[in-house]
């Protein structure tokens, strides 16, 4: 192991300690679950394991704040509260997280920040790292069993595109059944992966 690995390990430990204080225990357990799952998937798909772990750790770093505090952070970071964020305030944490990860947790890697920025809604043409964090968030071991989760967990280590498409389809169906607002990015992303030709 080189000196770089030691520094990386120390950086990660500092992030973990800070998150443990900032998040509720259940949210912190989920965070670790996403980080571990993302790093395992990264090994399978040849993606940088350190980046996957850090993105998994930081994806929900804004969840420790109340909705009111999240609104204030949106204003601070000039994030528009128009449109879906008005109807689906639970998406605010996704918008805030990249800024918070950079400012409070000193994460400067653009690929990590980009993966954090679309971990809930997805986006058209995601990179493998972005897909890995998106998938890991949905199916990490601490998640309660929901219809279709076993299929997702199998696909997660076989085909990122098929797995992404399945999650988006499940999410849209669930939100429709519950009568909840569906972010247009989620719909657009689903259509993209539904229509994407297999390589």
Residue ranges and their predicted role:
Residues 1-7:
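Short, small-residue-biased leader/transition segments that mark boundaries at the very start
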Residues 17-22, 44-166:
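Divalent metal-dependent catalytic cores for phosphoryl transfer on phosphate-bearing substrates
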Residues 25-27:
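A short, charge-rich alpha-helical start-of-domain segment used by transcription regulators
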Residues 30:
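N-terminal glycine-rich anion-binding loops that anchor highly charged ligand groups
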Residues 173-199:
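Charged phosphate-binding loop/patch that engages nucleotide di/tri-phosphates or the phosphate backbone
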């Amino acid at each position: 192991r080189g000196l770089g690995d030691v520094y990386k390990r120390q950086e990660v430990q500092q992030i973990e300690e800070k998150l443990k204080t900032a998040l509720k225990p259940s949210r912190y357990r989920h965070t670790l679950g996403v980080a571990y799952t993302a790093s395992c998937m990264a090994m399978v798909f040849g993606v940088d394991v350190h980046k996957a772990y850090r993105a998994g750790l930081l994806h929900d770093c804004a969840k420790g704040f109340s909705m009111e505090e999240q609104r204030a952070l949106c204003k601070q970071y000039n994030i528009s509260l128009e449109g879906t964020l008005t109807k689906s305030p639970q998406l605010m944490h996704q918008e805030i997280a990249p800024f918070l990860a950079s400012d409070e947790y000193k994460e400067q890697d653009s690929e990590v920040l980009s993966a954090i920025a679309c971990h809930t809604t997805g986006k058209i043409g995601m990179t493998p790292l972005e897909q890995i964090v998106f998938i890991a968030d949905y199916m990490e071991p601490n998640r309660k069993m929901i219809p279709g989760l076993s299929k997702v967990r199998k696909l997660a280590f076989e085909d990122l595109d098929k797995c992404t498409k399945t999650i988006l389809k499940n999410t849209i169906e669930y939100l429709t059944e519950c009568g909840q607002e569906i972010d247009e990015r989620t719909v657009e992303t689903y259509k993209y992966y539904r229509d994407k030709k297999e390589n």
